[in-house]
Amino acid sequence: MHLSPSIGHDLVTGTRFMGAFTMFALSILLAFVNRGKTQLKVYNQARWLIFTGCLLLCIFNLVQFLGNFREQSITLSWAITTMFLVAIIPPIFLGNLFLLRAGHDMKPHIWRSVIFVAFCYGLFFYGLTNDLLIDDVEPHTTVTFYIALALFAKITQMAIVLHRGLKKTRSSLTDGELQQRHVALRYTSHAMNALLVVAVFAPWAGLSSSTLLYTITKLTLLMTLSWLVCEFCLYGYNMAEAIEVNDEIRE
């Protein structure tokens, strides 16, 4: 079955990102298994729903790929892919997992797993770029991902220091100082989330054959919606500590 150039481009693009996000979906499952449930039932249900949607989307695209894309289904497939990619940003879950667990009982194999997943993402993206000789995808976008990953590691380290400092010095701080520490931790978390969104969507900048204005608009919309999802994840993971700190401030 012959595919037009535009359809073939969508097939290659969709397959590449579905492969990468499948690995991230598996990393989410690992993170969920290694973290106890929170008391927020709605949040627990939502995170599993997002993971399930991610996995089903990957399966859907895999079936489409193995069965050969049909021209009438490519639009639907790409629309569903875009819709779910807005709601499934696995690195955000792992980043917030780090922020909460690194200060107390972080397990070493989780760190190793994340490093492995990040490496696979970069290798997968770089390998397909060269093997398939896609003209409008530059290999240097992989370097962008690793630079963002390094910055993410630095911001995570800052968040861990703030988190541990807040725990150790909580009893000796005044109400104002305690609130300032908590605000610093919160804004550091926001910065980490925003940076992770950039890391995930930076490679998309070279994938569009449309006008520059359309590409910028699309990226801005996706990154904004994804950042809101990040904030939802941050809210759930840090809710227990936020309530505890606020209760102490009130007392």
What are these regions (language model features)?
Residues 230-251:
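Membrane-proximal linker segments that couple transmembrane helices to downstream signaling/catalytic modules
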Residues 1-26, 145-152:
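Hydrophobic transmembrane alpha-helical segments in integral membrane proteins
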Residues 2-5, 36-39, 55-81, 102, ...:
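Helix-loop junctions on the outward
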Residues 96-129, 139-151, 175-195:
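The cytoplasmic-loop to transmembrane-helix boundary for the fourth helix
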Residues 16-35, 45-68, 84-90, 115-127, ...:
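Hydrophobic alpha-helical transmembrane segments of multi-pass membrane proteins
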Residues 27-33, 91-99, 152-175, 228-232:
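Alpha-helical transmembrane segments in multipass membrane proteins, preferentially the mid-helix core
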Residues 73-77, 139-157, 219-222:
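Alpha-helical transmembrane segments
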Residues 34-48, 74, 98-111, 137-138, ...:
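Membrane-interface helix-boundary motifs at transmembrane edges
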